[in-house]
From Swiss-Prot:
InterPro entries: 6-PGluconate_DH-like_C_sf (IPR008927), 6PGD_dom2 (IPR013328), Mannitol_1_phos_5_DH (IPR023028), Mannitol_DH (IPR000669), Mannitol_DH_C (IPR013118), Mannitol_DH_N (IPR013131), NAD(P)-bd_dom_sf (IPR036291). GO terms for molecular function: mannitol-1-phosphate 5-dehydrogenase activity. GO terms for cellular component: cytosol. It comes from Coccidioides immitis (strain RS). Catalyzes the NAD(H)-dependent interconversion of D-fructose 6-phosphate and D-mannitol 1-phosphate in the mannitol metabolic pathway. Its EC number is 1.1.1.17. NCBIfam families: PRK02318.2-5. Keywords: NAD, Oxidoreductase. Belongs to the mannitol dehydrogenase family. Pfam families: Mannitol_dh, Mannitol_dh_C. This is Mannitol-1-phosphate 5-dehydrogenase.
Length: 388
């Protein structure tokens, strides 16, 4: 019997990153989603194309050997597929993990295969698989929780690949950056060994990879988006072509680099090279990306462990400079009432109805005695006063 992977999330990352590499590693991929349009399209086509874009041009691959299930209508089938799968992955967004946990828990509980299921969440969030693991445990019969590790092993991952705005007529086909990084911790698999997925770099300690990626790629990308949005730019390329915005991005990444170098002992020169590569990637004209898309979900992006507050809070605790990160946070706070982005409307409401202190606590999760708190309050109060 061939290898099988169940993947939650039929979106661009699911099809164009995770699905592509599972296919190339000879897995049959079972896509699971609640969106009728995506599932209907996947069920109606025997293949789709992934076009990798770089400065050297484009290269197209074809993905086949997949099926698709609508979990809204066929949850029992999803559970059955998980019970016989080798791997479960997801790219659904951190806020959706709690909704996919019940069928995963049921599928794991129904397993009779000796080898434990490998579960890897592919989300832009620190410890996303740990979060999913917690939800799975909450949805497992208490008498079966202790033996859960005999049926499934959960490993955190760090993913890095830019998916630009897609052509509205592209259907299932995905245009995606050629560069990628998919790093997964191997320790949880213990004596069983990790699953065979060629694209993955398996490591003992994931923390440096997760924070370096989140606090460089995501911090840089979001900084360009928020400054660009507030300065009337349409795309990230346009934003990064503006010397002022490029300088703001560089300054923010200089601060996050201080943290990465100090905390993990990564050589400063190596981190500088990494930053240069990231700045070049997000400035790529072939990956033209709309600022509203990159900036969407500002509430999540202003969160405690996220791309701004995460590094800034740790730097403040170390007594280091955070001016550029505070500037980027201020721009994120100004990302309000953006069409088709519910969080931007909620952000506007919070800033209108709450005091600066209460809004800061609610948005960032910072404690009032944290060394960063008062400095964020200043920025929140400034934004509440209106346009800069």
């Amino acid at each position: 019997m061939g290898k099988k992977a169940v993947h939650f999330g039929g979106g661009n990352i699911g099809r164009g990153f995770v699905g592509e590499f599972l296919h190339e590693s000879d897995y049959e991929v079972v896509f699971v989603d609640v969106m009728d349009s995506i599932i209907d399209a996947l069920q109606g086509a025997s293949s789709y194309k992934v076009t990798e874009v770089s400065n050297e041009g484009e290269h197209t691959k074809t993905v086949t050997n997949y099926r698709a299930i609508n979990s809204k209508h066929n949850l029992d089938q999803v559970i059955s597929e998980i019970s016989t799968a080798d791997v479960v992955t997801c790219a659904v967004g951190p806020n959706i993990l709690k909704f996919i946990a019940p069928p995963i828990a049921k599928g794991i509980d129904a397993r009779t295969i000796e080898r434990p299921l490998a579960v890897v969440a592919c989300e832009n969030a620190i410890g996303a698989t740990d979060t999913l693991h917690k939800f799975v445990k909450e949805n497992t019969d208490p008498s079966r929780v202790e033996s859960l590790s005999s049926r499934a092993r959960f490993a955190n991952s760090a993913i890095d690949r830019i998916v630009p705005t897609q052509d509205p007529d592209s259907g299932l086909d995905v245009k995606i950056e050629k560069f990628y990084e998919w790093v997964v911790e191997k320790t949880p698999f213990g004596e069983w060994g990790h699953p065979d997925i060629q694209a993955i770099l398996w490591v003992d300690n994931l923390d440096p990879y997760i924070e370096r990626k989140l606090y460089t790629v995501n911090t840089g990308h979001a900084t360009a988006a928020y400054y660009g949005y507030n300065m009337g730019k349409k795309t990230i390329y346009e934003s990064m072509s503006d010397e002022k915005i490029r300088g703001h991005v560089r300054d923010a990444l200089s601060e996050t680099s201080t943290l990465i170098v100090d905390k993990y002992g990564i050589p400063a020169q190596e981190q500088r090279k990494y930053v240069d590569a990231i700045v070049a990637r997000i400035s790529n004209p072939h990956l033209e990306d709309v600022v509203e898309r990159v900036g969407r979900a500002p509430l999540r992006k202003l969160g405690r462990k996220e791309r701004f507050v995460g590094p800034a809070s740790q730097l403040a605790e170390r007594g280091k400079k955070v001016d550029a990160l505070l500037g980027a946070m201020e721009q994120a706070l100004r990302f309000q009432n953006v069409l088709e982005d519910d969080e931007s409307f909620e952000l506007a409401k919070i800033l209108k109805t709450e005091s600066a202190e209460d809004a800061t606590a609610k948005l960032t999760g910072l404690e009032s005695d944290h060394p960063l708190f008062a400095r964020v309050v200043e920025r929140v109060a400034k934004v509440q006063k209106g346009p800069k």
